[in-house]
Regions:
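Basic, amphipathic alpha-helix used for nucleic-acid engagement in HTH/winged-helix/SANT-Myb modules
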Residues: 1-18
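Amphipathic alpha-helical packing segments from all-alpha helical-bundle domains
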Residues: 113-130, 134-186
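Short, amphipathic alpha-helix enriched in basic
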Residues: 17-46, 50-54, 67, 74-77
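Residues in the helix-turn-helix
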Residues: 58
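C-terminal peripheral helix-coil segments that are non-catalytic and often amphipathic
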Residues: 1-3, 172-187, 196-263
Length: 263
């Protein structure tokens, strides 16, 4: 923006709330296409000023430093973005479809457990594919990586507060989803385990394997062959099999000879 542009903007007197909204909108549009990177070095205020078509002087009256702008922007991104809505809706939809087409197996605890394993197999695969292609997920992980690497100050505290809020929200939503599934299957966890622990563990497994799969895809894309819903061998991704193993270890076992449940 040159001096004549700045003079023209002064004459229009854009209100501060509009300047703020335009700047954040311009930045969000860029980030929605390209994502965040660790360190936030790719967030150029001058470029956003140009895209937003607002006076530079007005921008720096709102945010005296780039760090203040970044902190404000981070909060805005992760309040409004789709990714902040919780667990992967595609995975949950796929798992629901497995449940709905498996009514013949739901009459016994053993059958319900088999359906649960199939839901994990299909749902975990869906989550992996979604995360691999998700700009939002990459941005979220960049946010987490920066929470301890930024210099001390208000900007770092604001970023950490956003990361903590998001991590808590996502974990609690996944916890609630797991509790709903346990209730649906008339299942319970062994004493000492909680659905919040389960939410943390499954998220860590999925995130970790997807991250490492970007470097070691030939190894981490390997599949495990094991019985599926009907007892026939099917392919399990490492993510799905690991999550199944975690869930199996945390669930109360079922009796093989339990009579059919009333329906």
């Amino acid at each position: 923006m040159n001096d004549s542009d700045e003079t023209a903007f002064r004459s229009t007197r854009i209100p501060a709330d509009q300047v703020r909204a335009r700047m954040l909108r311009a930045a969000r549009e860029v980030i929605s296409a390209h994502g965040l990177t660790v360190g936030f070095a790719h967030l150029p205020m001058e470029e956003y000023i140009r895209l937003a078509a607002v006076p530079r002087s007005s921008v720096y009256r709102i945010w005296s430093t780039r760090e203040e702008f970044v902190a404000d922007l981070i909060g805005e991104i992760f309040v409004a973005d789709r990714f902040a809505d919780g667990a992967d809706p595609d995975a949950q939809r796929a798992m629901t479809e497995v449940y709905e087409r498996s009514s013949a197996h739901l009459g016994t605890a053993v059958g319900r457990r088999q359906v649960a394993w199939e839901m994990i197999r299909i749902g975990a695969n869906s989550s992996v594919e979604t995360l691999r292609a998700s700009v939002d997920w990459s941005s979220y992980n960049a946010l987490l990586a920066c929470t301890f690497s930024m210099e001390e100050g208000p900007a770092r505290e604001a970023v950490r507060a956003t990361a903590r809020r998001l991590e808590t929200m996502l974990s609690q939503r996944l916890r609630d989803y797991y509790q709903d599934v346990l209730d649906q299957f008339s299942a319970s966890l062994r004493p000492g385990f909680t659905t919040l622990q389960l939410a943390h563990l499954t998220a860590i497994v999925t995130d970790g394997l997807v991250h490492r799969g970007r470097l070691l895809d030939d190894e981490l894309d390997a599949v495990v062959t094991a019985p599926g819903l009907d007892g026939e061998p099917v392919e399990w991704s490492l993510t799905a099999w690991t999550i199944r193993s975690i869930v199996d270890g945390m669930l109360e076992p079922v009796a093989e000879d339990e009579p059919p449940a009333d329906r």
